Design a protein with these regions (language model features):
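Hydrophobic structural segments
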Residues: 1-153
Length: 153
């Protein structure tokens, strides 16, 4: 699913995002917007969230949204010519010692960088965020009184 970001506008609690000289949001702007909606501090201690690759100063004209950062998603992103991929699940759950192109995850990073595509993920931070994945699912199935399994950190 590809999406062209709308121009940034100030929202409650958020200042205006910066933009490139062409008026596009930057990778850094998109990261800031996602992190404002799903603060990294809400992520589980075992989880990985954030910008995996990409230059925060680069413009973003289109974004591909996906659940997992797998090869088929990278193929679609490259074919569609998007500037950024945002996934729910992380590429790496733990720190990595290498990103060799001989490793499937390393190959993913290499392909994205060569294509000039940034990769951002928001996993448990988005699950736990107010109005996030858990809240949306609860609402969809008709739950009216919900509490988190684990309290917010």
């Amino acid at each position: 699913m590809s999406h062209t970001p709308a121009p940034a506008s100030p929202e409650a609690g958020h200042g205006p995002a910066s933009s490139t000289s062409e008026g596009h949001l930057t990778v850094g702007d998109v990261v800031a917007l996602v992190e404002a909606a799903a603060p990294p501090g809400l992520a589980a201690s075992w989880d990985s969230n954030g910008l995996i690759c990409g230059d925060p100063a680069e413009p973003v004209r289109s974004i591909l949204l996906a659940v997992d950062p797998v090869a088929a998603v990278v193929d679609e992103a490259i074919d569609a010519g998007v500037d950024m991929v945002i996934t729910h699940h992380p590429l790496y759950l733990r720190g990595t010692e290498h990103v060799a192109a001989t490793d499937p995850k390393g190959r993913t990073v290499h392909r994205l960088i060569r294509a000039g595509i940034a990769l951002l993920n928001a996993h448990t931070s988005l699950d736990a965020a107010h109005g996030g994945v858990a809240d949306a699912l609860a609402e969809r199935v008709g739950l009216v009184s919900t509490v988190p399994l684990e309290p917010d950190p």
